[in-house]
Design a protein with these regions (language model features):
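Outer-membrane beta-barrel translocator domains and adjoining extracellular loop/strand segments
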Residues: 44-51, 84-90, 131-141, 181-189
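Predominantly the C-terminal beta-signal and adjacent terminal strand-loop region
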Residues: 79-86, 96, 144-146, 150-201
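Cleavable N-terminal export/targeting peptides
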Residues: 1-29
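Residues that define the transmembrane beta-barrel architecture of outer-membrane proteins
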Residues: 29-31, 50-56, 93-101, 117, ...
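Extended hydrophobic secondary-structure segments that form protein cores and membrane-embedded regions
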Residues: 34, 119-125, 172-174
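Short glycine/proline- and aromatic-enriched beta-strand/turn motifs that initiate or cap beta-hairpins
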Residues: 21-65, 200
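Gram-negative (and chloroplast) outer-membrane scaffold detector with strong preference
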Residues: 39, 61-138, 198-201
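Short loop/turn motifs that connect adjacent beta-strands in outer-membrane beta-barrel proteins
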Residues: 22-31, 68-70, 110-119, 163-167
Length: 201
């Protein structure tokens, strides 16, 4: 509920920014880049474990604008998971790093201010791999695992506002639903609040 309240406040702020943005430039390229970061709750599962914790993510994406209201994206995402609570399995500290390659489509659902701000929906598929996984148990022993591969479906809804002809600012609520795991550990994101800046060439 707190995330939803923050999101509504951000939505109102972004809408006000969009009102003062410039009109579209018909000479813009179909290509662009996007840099984003998110934070929120996540669950790490695998090998009979189900650990709830916090995650922070960064992403670097390339965008192809098929139309003014729809774009395709791919790139690299990196997720950091941490959990510091005692569980029934006596694990009290968990850290994991995952890298992902998404392929998704983002399209405008409705315009809030014509050609200035819009509500957007994003959905796709993402291949993820654990590049580091570490557990610390109650007796201070440690174990490290890597190589876990799993597929997920990233979903997001948010609001985007044009700051200028080239720059767009976006705020989103996002998640990743895990669909398949080929090896041990999987990371499922829940209730992420994401901010991103896009630049269209």
């Amino acid at each position: 509920m707190k995330l939803m309240k923050y999101f509504i406040c951000i939505l109102l702020c972004v809408c006000s920014l969009g009102v003062s943005a410039q009109e579209d430039n018909i000479f813009l390229s179909k290509w662009g880049i996007e840099f984003g970061a998110s934070v929120g709750r996540a669950q790490l599962t695998g090998n009979e474990l189900a650990l709830n914790g916090m995650t922070s993510n960064g992403n670097w994406l390339v965008s192809y604008y098929a139309t003014e209201r729809m774009r395709f994206q791919t790139g690299i995402t990196m997720s950091f998971f941490s959990n510091g609570s005692l569980t029934a399995d006596n694990y009290y500290n968990t850290n994991a790093i995952f890298i992902g390659i998404p392929a998704k489509i983002v399209f405008s659902i409705t315009e809030i201010a014509p050609k200035k701000a819009a509500i957007v929906l994003g959905i796709g598929v993402q291949a993820n791999k654990a590049i580091n996984y570490q557990l610390e148990t109650k007796d201070f022993s440690k174990s490290t695992s890597s190589g876990s591969v799993f597929l997920g479906v990233p979903i997001s809804i948010g609001v985007e506002s044009k700051l200028s002809d080239n720059y767009t600012l976006g705020f989103y609520l996002s998640t990743q639903v895990v669909t398949k795991s080929y090896k041990n550990y999987r990371l499922q994101n829940n209730d992420l609040l994401r901010i991103a800046v896009s630049y269209r060439f």
